[in-house]
Amino acid sequence: MLRDVNDEVLARGLRVAHDLFDGAVQRGKLTAEQAAAGKARLTSTTAWTGFGDCDLIVEAIVENVAVKQRLFAELLTVARSDALLATNTSALPLEEIAALLPDASRVVGLHFFNPVSRMPLVELVLGRATARAAAESALQFVKSLRKTPVICRSAPGFLVTRVLFFYLNEACRLWEEGVATEVLDAAMQAWAGRLADALDRRSRGGCDRLHLR
């Protein structure tokens, strides 16, 4: 089940999902029947109807603490008391996101890396209040997707993004020293491929998230 702010955004999201299924068929990863069954399971809504039946709800909205806090407060009104609540944040501490909740024991971080359909790594982030049962449920979910979980504590940037901070900051220092953006990104692309377009990556990721606290 996919929820978003309006039908236009939902339609775009469903198109992307359908394209991923079609691509998997073309690459021989799925049969046409499996892809059709997967598409049939996808539903979309702008309301909270049906979320009371969910075992797991994953938030993947804008990287803004206040907005995420409001969403998690809404989730408490619709989710089952035993449902696992996850955030896909790549850098924000769970304690801040769950600050308005009376009980954060079932809140975890599930940071999927882009493109999600192909990247195997998932950061499983555990907050100070995360219960052992919630952590185990999240771990089993990640494994069921045949992805590689890495368990890390809740801290700014977690594990991968925290290492990435320093790489991106050095790229900005080179830019301040006069190295052109195009030159720097082209050189890093030639050296390390798609993950190395440092300045473009920092811009798309949001500079406000790349400051260690």
Spell out what each predicted region is.
Residues M1-L20:
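NAD(P)+-binding Rossmann beta1-loop-alpha1 motif at the extreme N-terminus of oxidoreductases
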Residues R3-N6, T45, C54, E59-A60, ...:
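Generic beta-strand/beta-sheet core signal
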Residues E63-N64, K68, F72-D82, A131, ...:
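Long hydrophobic segments that form regular secondary structure
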